[in-house]
């Protein structure tokens, strides 16, 4: 499309420096790299959205969202008759009585959550395999 100068407020100087270096090393421009990165990021978000929408439409999952902080116990997960998608939260805390088997059977996805806290007995890789756009997974 048409090119114009755009200012991005709040862009991390570290990210800008890395993109700038990448542009020099690859012989492209900062704009081209940012455009491609945003294009891929948006496509990823759209794909995640579509996948979750399909699961919801098929009636395969329960969605819990719009809560800033949530603590989930074994009993909470066992009460559900379908796997759950946790989305759009600052933090999600799995209580100490939650184990790997319960995560495998009852947690469909964790999407757009700042920090997920898990008991030390729960595999962080298992949590990561069910996560999209999760900033941190912290064993406690």
Question: Where do the model's predicted regions map?
Answer:
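Short Lys/Arg-rich basic patches
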Residues: 1-12
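The alpha-helix within a helix-turn-helix
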Residues: 23
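Short, basic amphipathic alpha-helical segments that act as recognition/interaction helices
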Residues: 28-52
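Short, positively charged interaction helices/loops
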Residues: 43-76
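Repetitive beta-strand solenoid architecture
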Residues: 66, 80, 88, 94, ...
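Short, solvent-exposed loop/turn at the beta-strand->alpha-helix junction
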Residues: 97-101, 123-124
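General marker for long, soluble alpha-helical cores
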Residues: 129-139
